[in-house]
């Protein structure tokens, strides 16, 4: 049993050039726009897909066998998309710190993620990816990892971002493991 994912790099490159970069020019200060990279964008997409497999699918709640999907009901897809995003960032940070991947990605992945968050949320919060990214953006703003600048652009505080992705990953993984709908 397993899964197979097909990623079309040329399609993602077109999304990056035609959608993400124009969004970054509006949403980020000029200096931060230099920290938006295709490698960080594409690598995070790959990690996002891998992270869908992270965590339990079958759990035990109150002595009964069930699934995370059954327990989380209509919130499951939103929480799953948020988990894949934030745990993907967490995993990339771990791999970069251990030099399993080029550590240079650490300089661009958070700012690229911020720009990409605006790309994802434009689909609205009536869709799982949009709701998931809205949760993450609000969490990052609350933790000071994302900040709104006086010119109404957005920036990343890398140090706070590292702590925020770790804590949000932990919260989501715990929520799923416990099947905590409330």
Where are these regions (language model features)?
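Active-site-adjacent "gating/activation" loops or surface patches in catalytic cores
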Residues: 1-69
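Proteins with a high burden of low-complexity, intrinsically disordered sequence enriched in S/T/G/P/A and R
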Residues: 1-3, 79, 86, 128
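Generic structural "secondary-structure junction" signal
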Residues: 8-10, 25, 74, 78, ...
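Residue-identity detector for glutamine
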Residues: 12, 21, 33, 70-71, ...
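Alpha-helix capping and helix-loop boundary segments enriched in small/acidic/polar residues
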Residues: 30-41, 67-82, 101-105, 109
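An active-site-proximal "capping" alpha-helix that borders the catalytic cofactor pocket
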Residues: 77-94
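Long, well-structured alpha-helical subdomains associated
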Residues: 89-181
């Amino acid at each position: 049993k397993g899964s197979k994912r097909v990623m079309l790099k040329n399609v993602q490159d077109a999304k990056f050039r035609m959608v993400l970069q124009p969004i970054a020019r509006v949403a980020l200060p000029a200096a931060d726009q230099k920290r938006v990279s295709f490698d960080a964008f594409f690598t995070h997409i790959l990690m996002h897909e891998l992270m869908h497999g992270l965590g339990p699918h079958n759990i035990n709640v109150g002595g009964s066998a069930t699934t995370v999907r059954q327990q989380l009901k209509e919130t499951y897809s939103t929480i799953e998309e948020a988990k894949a995003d934030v745990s993907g960032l967490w995993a990339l940070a771990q791999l970069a710190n251990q030099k399993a991947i080029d550590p240079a990605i650490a300089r661009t992945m958070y700012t690229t993620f911020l720009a990409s968050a605006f790309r994802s949320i434009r689909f609205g919060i009536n869709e799982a990816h949009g709701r998931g990214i809205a949760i993450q953006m609000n969490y990052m703003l609350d933790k000071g990892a994302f900040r709104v600048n006086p010119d109404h652009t957005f920036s990343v505080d890398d140090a706070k971002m590292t702590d925020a992705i770790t804590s949000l990953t932990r919260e989501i993984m715990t929520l799923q493991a416990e099947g905590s709908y409330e």
